[in-house]
Regions:
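N-terminal secretory signal peptides that target proteins for export/translocation
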Residues: 1-3
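Bacterial N-terminal signal peptides
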Residues: 6-19
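Extended surface/linker regions that mediate inter-domain or inter-protein docking
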Residues: 25-68, 76-136, 141-150, 155-173, ...
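Beta-propeller blade signature
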Residues: 61-68, 122-136, 181-202, 242-274, ...
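Catalytic cores of eukaryotic secretory-pathway lumenal/extracellular enzymes that build
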Residues: 93, 101, 107-116, 124-132, ...
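Beta-propeller domains
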Residues: 207-243, 259-386
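Eukaryote-specific, cytoplasm-facing alpha-helical/coiled-coil scaffolding segments in long proteins
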Residues: 251-257, 317-326, 402, 525-526
Length: 669
């Protein structure tokens, strides 16, 4: 039901209606922004997009509704927020709208304020707001969400099934203010710390995923799964490659407040990333890792994994090998037969198709230069579908996945924020360009090569093509202090981004982690009360991890050893002739915020995660024969270990000497 019919009308309200291209579509909400050509850690970038400073996000944007008849309404202006002309203290920027299950309210992120005078330096934060009274003749009301972390940036919210709000924040892990901001594992720039869950009425705040390089764009699908993009970047610090002291990288003794700053840049895991690393082994290949993968979890943070356990062996076009001295270990360059024929490195801005549950649209885009815009793709991944049966389907032509200075005729420009609608229409924000963006104006009068407009897409041959924009364009004159320069946009056509359909949706059943039958049987045989164990874990902020047989591995992963046996045991899995590797221990690493920059005398704010042997848990049996932070693998290949809850973790299987044999490539929790 449209908003015209769903909401009682009031004739005495203030509303702003603008002419729009009258294409019959469901009601949608979207945001506008002044064109902002910079694309490194700015509001529409692939990472570092959470900052609210003037260099990261221009002021002057708004929150709009496009009603089904094409009428446009500026919700923020009608509610008394934002302005045209000089922005000053009333200037706003808006992002990330999400519609409630009932369709009668919207949560979004907004920053309020900009300098009122030149050189005025203030701190600004993205905060979460709700808007109600969405009818065409109603005056909308905007309120700030209660009990959110007001000292930090809160973005990308979504309504949970139980009225909790799941969102992205840069609040530091464990609330450790002295580690703020968390720095990513690539550029060591400020990033968010992952997904959080807030109960606004009580203030109960839970860190769902401690993400060392950040989480992005959560949604809840029709099956009740939280679906999001995670930046997976588990590698050694490139700002410390070969002990490069230009960045002044050093470690703290721990992440505790007051911990000693050490004259050390030691890194332990994973393996080296460059030839010049003094700790490298001649038999080990250099390692780097950089993917934005689709992930899933339950609303309480349990059962977190890549969607349907898909990974780079199903998605990537190239995977390097780990060891040089084993003919069975080889790099992957597309030589294996697999279902998925469209390789993607990054999968951004995921939206489920309301017409085909379990079908997910997203954007395959480069990391830099295009404001996270690129090719529209989709994958079918309902919960019961095996990862190796999932195929990525090209919606727009593959040429649109990246920039090209001499494009083919198939390169029809870049898309972002794909939105499949309940009437079967596909819309997205589209820019007619094939190049990386750059400022073609000046610092005082920025101009972008990109002109993001909301457009419907239609199938033309094998691929979808953009049609006429669904608005006639929204223009605005804006100025604000940077704070050094007066930045001006004169009658500029605003970008139209992040469209969401306003409709009622069936509330999915809330998912909970289910204890598998084999583990349940073990607990029963051992006389362990599962409820008591769960209470113990909760009280001690712990999790319990298990494996049934560590010698069994993914058949597609020929980049690490497949022939494994448990040291001193007959338990083994042999996939081919050749070298057999013994494994004796599982060495667990926890992500500690101990890496800082600027040197001991000019230390910069913020910390990067480094993998450190498990040390914050004392409940595991001792394993003096194994490496630090390890547990022994049982003769049948099984293992169990207590680990810290809500803390980034990774691991490796080692031999008796503590040398890595098989390494996990992702941060888990």
């Amino acid at each position: 039901m449209g908003l015209r019919a769903a909401i009682t009308l009031s004739l005495s309200v203030l509303f702003l209606a603008l002419s729009s291209t009258a294409v019959a579509l469901p009601d949608i909400v979207f945001v506008t922004q002044p064109p902002h050509p910079d694309d490194f850690a700015t509001v529409n970038a692939t990472f570092g997009s959470h900052r609210a400073s003037l260099d990261a996000v221009p002021r002057g944007g708004d929150l709009y509704i496009r009603y089904s008849d094409g009428t446009l309404k500026n919700l923020t202006a009608a509610a008394g927020y934002g302005k045209s002309g000089f922005q000053g203290a009333q200037g706003i920027a808006v992002r990330d709208p999400a519609v409630h299950w009932s369709g009668i309210k919207i949560i979004f992120s907004m920053v309020i304020g900009s300098p009122t005078a030149q050189y005025q330096v203030e701190t600004y934060r993205w905060q979460l707001y709700e808007v109600i009274k969405l009818g065409i003749t109603e005056t909308p009301q905007i309120t700030k969400l209660a009990n959110q972390p007001t000292s930090y940036n809160n973005v990308m919210p979504v309504y949970g099934t139980d009225e909790r709000i799941i969102f992205v924040s840069d609040r530091p892990q464990g609330g450790q203010v002295h580690t703020y901001p968390q720095r990513d594992e690539y550029e060591s720039t400020a990033t968010n710390s992952g997904l959080w869950s807030l109960h606004p009425a009580s203030g109960d705040l839970i860190h769902l995923d401690h993400a060392p390089s950040g989480d992005f764009s959560p949604t809840i699908d029709s099956f009740g799964r939280v679906i999001f993009t995670r930046w997976d970047h588990l590698q050694r610090d490139q700002q410390n490659r070969c002990s490069n002291q230009g960045f002044g990288a050093f470690n703290y003794a721990s992440e505790q407040a007051g911990a000693a700053a050490l004259d050390s840049d030691q890194e332990l895991y994973p393996e080296q990333r460059a030839q010049c690393d003094g700790s490298r082994s001649e038999n080990i290949e250099n390692h780097s890792f950089n993917h934005f993968l689709p992930w899933q979890m339950n609303e309480d943070g349990t059962d977190m994994e890549t969607i349907n356990h898909i990974g780079r062996h199903e998605l990537a076009s190239y995977i390097p090998k780990t060891f040089r001295n084993d003919v069975n270990i080889e790099e992957f360059y597309g030589q294996y037969t697999r279902v998925n024929q469209q390789a993607v490195t990054n999968f951004f801005q995921i939206q489920e198709d309301p017409v085909i549950p379990g079908s997910y649209f997203g954007i395959s885009a480069p990391e830099f230069g295009t404001h996270a815009s690129g090719q529209i793709v989709k994958m079918s991944a309902p919960p019961t579908k095996a990862a190796d049966q999932i195929a990525v389907i090209a919606i727009t032509h593959p040429d649109t996945s990246g920039p090209d200075a001499t494009p083919s005729v198939a390169h029809i420009g870049f898309s972002r924020d794909p939105l499949p609608l309940s009437d079967g229409t596909l819309i997205a924000s589209h820019a007619v360009t094939s190049e990386d963006d750059t400022n073609i104006g000046s610092s005082a009068s920025p101009a972008s090569k990109y002109n993001f407009r909301l457009k419907s897409f239609a199938l033309s041959g094998q691929y979808y093509m953009p049609a006429t924009p669904i608005t006639t364009g929204i223009t605005k004159t804006i100025s604000y202090w940077s704070p050094d320069l007066l930045v001006s946009y004169n009658n500029v056509t605003m970008w139209e981004l992040q469209a969401r359909e306003i409709r009622t949706r069936a509330l999915p059943a809330r998912l909970h982690a289910i204890l598998p039958a084999p583990e349940g049987a073990v607990f029963q045989q051992s006389g362990v009360d599962v409820a008591e164990l769960r209470n113990y874990l909760t009280e001690n902020n712990l999790a319990l991890i298990i494996s049934r047989n560590v010698t069994r591995r993914d058949n597609l992963d020929h980049q690490q050893p497949l022939n494994l046996q448990v040291e001193g045991s007959t338990t083994r899995t042999v996939k081919n002739d050749g070298k057999l590797y013994s494994v004796a221990h599982l060495q667990i690493f926890q992500g500690d915020l101990i890496r800082a920059y600027g040197g001991l005398s000019n230390t910069q704010a913020g910390r990067r995660v480094l993998a450190q042997p498990l040390h914050s848990v004392s409940q595991n049996p001792g394993n003096r024969a194994g490496p630090n932070g390890s547990v022994k693998i049982a003769a049948d290949g099984s293992l169990a270990a207590f680990v810290p809850a809500r803390r980034a973790l990774t691991y490796q299987l080692t031999n008796n000497a503590g040398e890595g044999v098989v390494r996990e490539r992702l941060w888990l929790h």
